[in-house]
Amino acid sequence: KYIGFDIDLANAIGEKMGTKVEVKSLGFDALIPALRSGQIDMIASGMDATPERQKQVSFTEPYFQDGYSVVVRKDNTNINGFDDLKGRTVGSQVGTKGVDLATEAGATVKQYDANSQGWMELQSGTCDAVVINTSVALYYMKEGGDKDLKIVGDAKKADAGIAMAVSKDKPELLEKVNKALADLKADGTYAKLYKKWFGVDPKA
């Protein structure tokens, strides 16, 4: 069973639309091709609605303003934010803005398919830091990751906002998903799910 804020939100959207959601797990790079070929109907995977991606898919209204944070081991005193990543080995998930941010900071970047690989490498010392969605970092810390790891420095904002994606061929689906999202925000479901996963209230 897959879990996460995105999954809970997707299921709640399905409920509002009166349809059952079936979750398929795919590598991040495979998501847009799968959507365009009709293999899946919607992407709910913390995807930044970037201008490049907007050429290929239709995005809903953003449901999350996320950023990217630097995470290091607790005993690390040399890395206190993005400015200290130059010349370091830094892990980040393939296809995400984290890779770009780490590269821009002058790091040697190791790319992972799954965030779990990043946590493992960080704990075993094969990378110095991980650049990851702030939301993922917050959740991981809340679930006990803060025993060994810490978030350092300020987060860098993800400009476009995080949104669900649907095929450009399905404008009616986009409309329904947007309406369901608006309803979930209005009836308090969204805030409840947000608090459940991140331990904080959503920023207005």
What are these regions (language model features)?
Residues 1, 10-19, 95-115, 141-146:
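Ligand-binding cleft/hinge of the Venus flytrap
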Residues 1-46, 187:
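Extracytoplasmic small-molecule ligand-binding "clamshell" domains
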Residues 7-16, 76, 94-96, 161-201:
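Extended ligand-binding regions for polar small-molecule ligands
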Residues 13, 35-36, 85, 122-123, ...:
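Hydrophobic residues within well-ordered alpha-helices
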Residues 18-20, 36-45, 88-89, 124-136, ...:
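Alpha-to-beta junction loops
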Residues 22-33, 77, 94-96, 110-124, ...:
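Short helix-initiation/N-cap motifs at beta->coil->alpha
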Residues 60, 73-89:
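Flexible hinge/capping segments at coil-to-helix
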Residues 65-72, 134, 138, 142-182, ...:
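Periplasmic-binding protein-like
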